[in-house]
Amino acid sequence: MATNTSSNLLTNPYTEREKKLIDEAYYRDLKYNLTSKSRWKFIGDVSETLSQICVGTSSVLAFASGFFEDIDILAFVAGTVGVGSLVLLQFSSYAMKESSERTQQVNVILTKLGLETIPDIVVEPSIIKARLQGELGEQENDVVIEV
């Protein structure tokens, strides 16, 4: 009975086929996760921007509803826009979390392949605040922007 040595494994046609399939799977996963990472980051940025616009609009409408007392619908619209702002802000947080998750998935594959990892460009506001207060040091793979 023959034993499999490392030289036999390298020349084995099944091993080469399997290696090719695994490499293709890694490539597909990297491509998908990099695209998803960018897409979720964009969605998060847009959602957060829209949320801030809604907060401003809601504030103006709330003020206007007190000034124009005969237009009852203004208070309702102000409240509705304010709630919409909260929904958009929560969705933005979800999208940023998804972007970070995709970055982690990409980094797992890159590490497995022996390649350099990419930094996570999403930093939660609580982390920024803690760093500014000196509570946390720099973390691996974080992009720190001095303010």
UniProtKB/Swiss-Prot annotation:
The keyword Transmembrane applies. It is a single-pass membrane protein. Coiled coil: none annotated. It is found in: Virion; Host membrane. Keywords: Host membrane, Membrane, Transmembrane, Transmembrane helix, Virion. It comes from the Viruses. The chain crosses the membrane at residues 71-91. GO terms for cellular component: host cell membrane; membrane; virion component. This is Uncharacterized protein R695.
